[in-house]
C-alpha cells in the first residue's frame, strides 16, 4: 500500500516537472530558436542512423552542415533585437551573446568538412562523431547566453563531456588515450574549483544565482568587498583558466593537441576559447563589478605569462600540433587584453574582431595539417621540408595562414592585433601592450622557420615523406580544400575590410 502511494506521488511529481518544462519551452522556445534547430538536427541524425545503412553517410554530413547553416541564418535574422531574458532568468539574448554564438556556429560549420576525409581514412564512427560536434556546439551556444550560475556550470559541462569523448575518439591510439585521461582529470578538477567559487558567490549575495541579481544581493548584504568575494574571484578565475588554457593553466593543452584527432583539435582550439571568453567576460564584468581592479590584475598576470611562455615554448617544438598548442596559449594572452580593456575603449569590439580573424587563421592552418597528415602520415615539422615542390597550393595556403597568425601586414592577423593593441594602449595598458608587441615579433620567428622549410628546394633537406608525396584520390578531398580556401581568403583580407567588421563588432556591446 505504501509503495503504491509513493509510486503515485512519483508519477504526479514527474508529470508536474514535465508540464512545467513543456510550458517553459512553449512560451520561451522562440528565444532559443537557433539552438532548437541544432536539437532537431541531432534527433534527425539519430533517426536516420537507426533506420539506414552505411551507404547513406553523405546524408549525415549534409544534415549536420545544413542544421548549422540554418541556425546561423536564424541567428542573423534575430540580429539587433532588444535584449530579452527568458526561461525564468536562466538565459539572456542580446547582440553580445549572439555574436559569440555566431562565431561558435561558424567554427563548427568549417570543421565538419575538415573531418570528412579523415573519418573515411581512419574508419571512425561517423554518426557519433557528428553528434558530439553538434552537442558541443549546442553547449557552447547555451554557455554564451547563460544568465545564472547553474546554466553557466551545466552548459560548459555539456561542451566538455563531448570534448573528452572527441579527444579519445581514436581508441587504439595510446597518445589519444593519454590525452583524454589528462583532459578529463584536469577538466574535472577545474569544474570543481569553478563550482567552489560559485558557492562563495551564491552565499555572499544572499542566495542569488542570476548574474545581475547577484550584484544587487552583494549590495544588500554589504559583502562586495568581503574575503568571500576574493575567494570566489580566485576560484572562478582558476576554473575559467583551465577552459581558456592561458599559462599557468596550460599543462593539458599540448598533450591534448598532439594526441587527439587533428579535426577534433581544430574544433576544440577555437570553439572552447570563444565560448569561455564570452562566459569569462560576463562573469567578471557583472558579478565582480566591485572587484574590477582585482580581476584586472589577475588577468594581466595571466596575459603576460601566456604571451611569454606560449611563444617561447613554441620555438622548441618539433611537432606541428604541439607548436600550435603553445601558439594558442600565446594567442589567448592577446584576447585577454580585450577583456581587460572592456567596454570603455572598444576592448570587446577588438576582442571579437581578433577572434573572428583567429578562427580563420587557425582553422586554415589545421586544414593544411589535416591534408598533409592524411597524405604523408606525419606531424613532424621537419617533414614539411620541400612541400612547395610537390604541392604549391597547400604550401602557400599554410604559409599565408602562419604569416597571418604571426601578424605580418597586410594580412588580417596584423590588423586584428593592431586594433587590439591600440585599444589596450588607449586604456593605459602600456606594459601589457609592449609585451604583446615583443612576443608577436618572437612568434614570427618560428612561423618563418616553418615557411622556410616549406619553400626549400634542396634535396638533402627533403624527407622521404615529401619525396613520396601523392595527392589523395578521394572525392571528399574537395571538402577539406574548400574549407581551407575559405579560411585562407579570410586570413588574407586586406585592411579595407576592417571597417564593416569593426562597425558590427562595436554594435554588439551590452
UniProtKB/Swiss-Prot annotation:
**Matching Pfam families:** Ndh2_N, Proton_antipo_M
| EC numbers, comma separated | 7.1.1.-
Keyword Chloroplast on this protein?
yes
| Record-level GO BP terms | ATP synthesis coupled electron transport; photosynthesis, light reaction
Q: Membrane topology per the record?
A: Multi-pass membrane protein
The UniProt GO MF terms for this protein read: NADH dehydrogenase (ubiquinone) activity; quinone binding
Q: Which InterPro entries match?
A: NADH-Q_OxRdtase_suN/2 (IPR010096), ND/Mrp_TM (IPR001750), Ndh2_N (IPR045693)
Q: Where are the membrane-spanning stretches?
A: 24-44, 59-79, 99-119, 124-144, 149-169, 183-203, 229-249, 295-315, 323-343, 354-374, 395-415, 418-438
Catalytic activities: a plastoquinone + NADH + (n+1) H(+)(in) = a plastoquinol + NAD(+) + n H(+)(out); a plastoquinone + NADPH + (n+1) H(+)(in) = a plastoquinol + NADP(+) + n H(+)(out)
Q: Which UniProt keywords apply?
A: Chloroplast, Membrane, NAD, NADP, Plastid, Plastoquinone, Quinone, Thylakoid, Translocase, Transmembrane, Transmembrane helix, Transport
Q: Where in the cell is it found?
A: Plastid, Chloroplast thylakoid membrane
Q: Does the keyword Translocase apply?
A: yes
User: Any idea what job this protein has?
Assistant: NDH shuttles electrons from NAD(P)H:plastoquinone, via FMN and iron-sulfur (Fe-S) centers, to quinones in the photosynthetic chain and possibly in a chloroplast respiratory chain. The immediate electron acceptor for the enzyme in this species is believed to be plastoquinone. Couples the redox reaction to proton translocation, and thus conserves the redox energy in a proton gradient.
Can you tell me which family this protein belongs to? Answer: Belongs to the complex I subunit 2 family.
Please identify the protein, giving its name as recorded.
NAD(P)H-quinone oxidoreductase subunit 2 A, chloroplastic
Annotated source species: Lolium perenne (Perennial ryegrass)
Amino acid at each position: 500500500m505504501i509503495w503504491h502511494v509513493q509510486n503515485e506521488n512519483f508519477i504526479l511529481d514527474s508529470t508536474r516537472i514535465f508540464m512545467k518544462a513543456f510550458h517553459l519551452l512553449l512560451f520561451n522556445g522562440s528565444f532559443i530558436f537557433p539552438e532548437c534547430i541544432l536539437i532537431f538536427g541531432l534527433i534527425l541524425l539519430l533517426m536516420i542512423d537507426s533506420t539506414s545503412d552505411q551507404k547513406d553517410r553523405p546524408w549525415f554530413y549534409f544534415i549536420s552542415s545544413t542544421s548549422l547553416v540554418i541556425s546561423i541564418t536564424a541567428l542573423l535574422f534575430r540580429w539587433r533585437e532588444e535584449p530579452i531574458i527568458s526561461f525564468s532568468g536562466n538565459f539572456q539574448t542580446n547582440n553580445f551573446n549572439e555574436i559569440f554564438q555566431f562565431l561558435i556556429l561558424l567554427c563548427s560549420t568549417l570543421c565538419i568538412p575538415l573531418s570528412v576525409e579523415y573519418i573515411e581514412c581512419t574508419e571512425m564512427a561517423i554518426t557519433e562523431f557528428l553528434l558530439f560536434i553538434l552537442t558541443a556546439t549546442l553547449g557552447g551556444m547555451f554557455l554564451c547566453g547563460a544568465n545564472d550560475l547553474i546554466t553557466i556550470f551545466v552548459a560548459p559541462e555539456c561542451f566538455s563531456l563531448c570534448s573528452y569523448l572527441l579527444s579519445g575518439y581514436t581508441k587504439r591510439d595510446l597518445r589519444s588515450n593519454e590525452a583524454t585521461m589528462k583532459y578529463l582529470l584536469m577538466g574535472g578538477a577545474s569544474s570543481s574549483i569553478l563550482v567552489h567559487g560559485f558557492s562563495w558567490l551564491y552565499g555572499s549575495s544572499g542566495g542569488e544565482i542570476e548574474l545581475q541579481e547577484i550584484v544587487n544581493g552583494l549590495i544588500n548584504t554589504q559583502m562586495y568587498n568581503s574575503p568571500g568575494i576574493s575567494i570566489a574571484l580566485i576560484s572562478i578565475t582558476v576554473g575559467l583558466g583551465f577552459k581558456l588554457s592561458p599559462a599557468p593553466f596550460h599543462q593539458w593543452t599540448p598533450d591534448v593537441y598532439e594526441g587527439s584527432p587533428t579535426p577534433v583539435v581544430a574544433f576544440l582550439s577555437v570553439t572552447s576559447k570563444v565560448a569561455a571568453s564570452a562566459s569569462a567576460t560576463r562573469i567578471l564584468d557583472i558579478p565582480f563589478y566591485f572587484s574590477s581592479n582585482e580581476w584586472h590584475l589577475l588577468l594581466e598576470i595571466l596575459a603576460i605569462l601566456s604571451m611569454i611562455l606560449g611563444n617561447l615554448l613554441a620555438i622548441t617544438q618539433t611537432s606541428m600540433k604541439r607548436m600550435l598548442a603553445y601558439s594558442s596559449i600565446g594567442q589567448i594572452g592577446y584576447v585577454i587584453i580585450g577583456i581587460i580593456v572592456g567596454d570603455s575603449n572598444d576592448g570587446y569590439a577588438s576582442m571579437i574582431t581578433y577572434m573572428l580573424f583567429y578562427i580563420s587563421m587557425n582553422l586554415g592552418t589545421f586544414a593544411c595539417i589535416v591534408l598533409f597528415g592524411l597524405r604523408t602520415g606525419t606531424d613532424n615539422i621537419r617533414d614539411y621540408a620541400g612541400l612547395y615542390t610537390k604541392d604549391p597550393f597547400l604550401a602557400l595556403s599554410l604559409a599565408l595562414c602562419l604569416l597571418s597568425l604571426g601578424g605580418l601586414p597586410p594580412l588580417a592577423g596584423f590588423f586584428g592585433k593592431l586594433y587590439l593593441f591600440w585599444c589596450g594602449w588607449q586604456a593605459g595598458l602600456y606594459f601589457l601592450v609592449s609585451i604583446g608587441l615583443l612576443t608577436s615579433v618572437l612568434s614570427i620567428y618560428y612561423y618563418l622557420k616553418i615557411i622556410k622549410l616549406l619553400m626549400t628546394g634542396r634535396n638533402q633537406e627533403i624527407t622521404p615523406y615529401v619525396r613520396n608525396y601523392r595527392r589523395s584520390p578521394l572525392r571528399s578531398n574537395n571538402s577539406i580544400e574548400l574549407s581551407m580556401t575559405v579560411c585562407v581568403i579570410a586570413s588574407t583580407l586586406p585592411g579595407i575590410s576592417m571597417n564593416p567588421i569593426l562597425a558590427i563588432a562595436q554594435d554588439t556591446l551590452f
